[in-house]
C-alpha cells in the first residue's frame, strides 16, 4: 500500500515533531482539506519556530480568508520584522506586497 502525501508527512512528524519543514508541509497539505488543522500547524510554527519566515505569508493569508483580519495584520507585520532581521529581503518584499494588498494600499497606475 502506498502512503498518501499527508500520511507520509504525519509519519515524518511522529519521528521528529520539532522539524519546522515537516510542520510547514503539514500546514500546507491540510490547507486543501481542513483549514482548522492547517491553522493549528501554522500557529505551532509561529509559536515554536518564529524565524521560519515562510510561515508568515501563508498564515496571514489564511487568517484573512477566515475573517480574522486583526490576526492577519499582526502576522504580516511580525513576518516583515522577522524577515528583515534575518536579512531575507525577498521574503520581506513578498510580505510587504501582500500586506499592502491586504490593507488596500496596492495602487495601480491607470
Which residues does each predicted region cover?
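Structural marker of alpha-solenoid helical repeat scaffolds
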Residues: 15, 48-49, 65, 82-86
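Structural motif corresponding to the intra-repeat A-B loop/turn of tetratricopeptide repeats
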Residues: 32-33, 66, 86, 106
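Alpha-helical linker/edge segments of TPR/alpha-solenoid repeat scaffolds
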Residues: 2, 71-74, 98-110
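Structural register within alpha-helical repeat arrays
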Residues: 25-26, 59, 99
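Residue at a conserved register position within TPR or TPR-like alpha-solenoid repeats
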Residues: 29-30, 63, 83, 103
